[in-house]
C-alpha cells in the first residue's frame, strides 16, 4: 500500500506541476474499483480487465459524477474511459462516447453496480474468475442473483487529490465504431453480393 501511495503522489505531482493550465479540468478523487477480488485495470491499449497488482497505475481511477446515478469512470493517468458497447463488450476509449456514460446504483453493504441499458437489457461492468471482462446482460427487471459475484463493486477511496490533465471532451460520440478491418470486410461482402445479384438478374433477362 505504501508503494501505491508513492505512485499516486507522483501522478498528482506530475499532473499538477507540469501540465499546461488550459488542460487542467479540475480535481477528482482517486479510487480503485474492486470486482471479484481483482482491481479493475483500465489500460492505454484500449483493454479493461482485472489485476491483483494493487500498485499498478492502470488501477488508479477517477469516478466522475455527471448526473444523479450517472458517472464516468476514467483512468487518472491515461485518461481512458471505461465503456460498454451494445454487445456487452467492455473496453477503454480515449474518446468519450455514449458507451462510456455508466449508470451506477449503490447497494447495501457498501457495494454498487455499474451498467448500461440497451434495448431493455442491462449490460454490467463485470469480471470473470480469471480477471477477464465477463459479458453479463440481463432483462432490465431481472435480479442478478448468482451473477452478483461478477458484478458487485467495492470502491476503495485513495486519500489523494489528483489534478486532472485530461482534456475536456468537446462532444460525445454516439457509440464505438467498427474497426477498419471489419468495415472493409463488410463493404467487400456487400459489393460482392450486389455484383453477383446484378449478374444473376442480367442472366435471367
From Swiss-Prot:
GO molecular function: growth factor activity
Pfam families in UniProt: FGF (PF00167)
PROSITE patterns the record matches: HBGF_FGF
Record key words, sorted: Growth factor, Signal
CDD domains registered for this protein in UniProt: beta-trefoil_FGF_Bnl-like
Signal sequence interval, chain numbering: 1-17
Source organism superkingdom: Viruses
Family membership noted in the UniProt record: Belongs to the heparin-binding growth factors family.
Record PANTHER family: FIBROBLAST GROWTH FACTOR
Protein name per Swiss-Prot or TrEMBL: Fibroblast growth factor homolog
Gene name as annotated: FGF
